[in-house]
Design a protein with these regions (language model features):
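Glycine-rich oxoanion-binding loops at beta->alpha junctions
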Residues: 56, 63-96
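Conserved active-site and cofactor/substrate-binding residues in soluble primary-metabolism enzymes
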Residues: 7-14, 43, 55, 59, ...
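Glycine-rich, flexible N-terminal cofactor/catalytic loop recognition
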Residues: 34-66, 73
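N-terminal amphipathic/basic leader segments beginning at the initiator methionine
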Residues: 1-47
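Short glycine-rich or small-residue beta-strand-to-loop segments that form or flank ligand, phosphate
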Residues: 2, 46-53, 69-76, 94, ...
Length: 104
């Protein structure tokens, strides 16, 4: 299998740049490595946040969008997102209707 990786140390950052370029309806918080809906938070909707280790794309960030996740945290390669990332995602999609979070 051929892999298109410029530098292993930059793979997560470059993947997020690719998501941002390919999906204008999504936003990326580059400081926290979070992909989230551009229209978040949605009034009257429970926020749904997921996250997990990078390296299995399009898993988690690939499921952000209408009828799916509101935000996804990209951990480092094969590493779960850190609590600060999940907290930052919580603040991005918070609307007072509660949230569901799942991280792997």
């Amino acid at each position: 299998m051929k892999k298109l990786i410029n530098n292993p140390n930059d793979v997560v950052v470059e993947a997020l740049l690719g998501v941002e370029a390919a999906h204008p309806d999504l936003q990326v918080d580059h400081a926290n490595k979070i992909v989230y809906r551009g229209d978040a938070p949605k009034p009257g909707k429970v926020g749904i946040i997921s996250g997990g280790g990078s390296g299995h794309e399009p898993l988690h960030g690939g499921f952000v969008g209408l009828g799916m996740l509101d935000a996804a945290c990209a951990g480092e390669v094969f590493t779960s997102p850190v609590p600060d990332q999940m907290l930052a995602a919580t603040k991005l999609v918070k609307d007072g209707y509660g949230q569901l979070r799942a991280a792997a």
